[in-house]
Every structure is written in C-alpha cells, then in structure tokens.
C-alpha cells in the first residue's frame, strides 16, 4: 500500500508498478534429414522409407530417391532436432530389420 503524507499527497514510497514482461523466445533450430546412396539398398525400399517415415507421396518419394541415386545424397525433410533425431533412428532401424545398409543422417539447416 502507498503511504500518504500530510495533506493527502502520495509520495510514491511503498508503491509499485507491475509491468508484464514477455519472455524472448527463439524459434528452435532446424535440421535436414538426409538419406545417403549405397550400392545395395533397393530403390523401392528407399521409396517405402520416404513414404512411411516422411509422409511423402509416391511421386515425391520417387523423385527424392532418384536424386539420392544420381547425386549420392538427398533431403527427406527439415525438422526440429528431436523430430529429426527420431526419424533418423526410425530409418536406420527399419533398414537394419530389412537387412539393408541404408544410411540416414541429419545436419543443421
């Protein structure tokens, strides 16, 4: 409570002003998930992985697979760190279960 001086004037002692401070937030860093070409993984399996784990249409998955085949690497998508890390693990796990040497990595965008 504010204290009052004689004469009814408020000298401001004991009063406070509450201001709302909005926290400064940053957007999370994004990471590209990459599939690497190899000579052993069937092209159809790469298309399956892109459809299954990255929700790509058959057409987009085929286009990305051909890019990987011709250029050695291709971007599957861009995600936050945790999502990218999970997708990399899912792809590698699926490749191992199907006995393919397919490699998947992530890098900061």
UniProtKB/Swiss-Prot annotation:
Cysteine disulfide links: none
Entry-linked HAMAP family: ClpS
Segments for region (Disordered): 1-21
Quaternary structure annotation from Swiss-Prot or TrEMBL: Binds to the N-terminal domain of the chaperone ClpA.
Family according to the record: Belongs to the ClpS family.
InterPro entries: ClpS, ClpS_core, Ribosomal_bL12_C/ClpS-like
Gene Ontology BP annotations: protein catabolic process; proteolysis
Protein name as catalogued: ATP-dependent Clp protease adapter protein ClpS
Function statement: Involved in the modulation of the specificity of the ClpAP-mediated ATP-dependent protein degradation.
Pfam family, one: ClpS
Annotated organism of origin: Caulobacter sp. (strain K31)
């Amino acid at each position: 409570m504010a204290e009052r001086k004689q004469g009814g004037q408020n000298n401001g002692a004991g009063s406070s002003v509450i201001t709302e401070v909005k926290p400064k937030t940053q957007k999370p860093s994004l990471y590209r998930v990459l599939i690497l070409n190899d000579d052993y993984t069937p092209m159809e399996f790469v298309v399956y992985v892109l459809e299954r784990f990255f929700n790509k249409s058959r057409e987009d998955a085929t286009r990305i697979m051909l890019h990987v085949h011709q250029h050695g690497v291709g971007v599957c998508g861009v995600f936050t760190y945790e999502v990218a890390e999970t997708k990399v693990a899912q792809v590698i796990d699926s490749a191992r279960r199907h006995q393919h040497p397919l490699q998947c990595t992530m890098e900061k965008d």
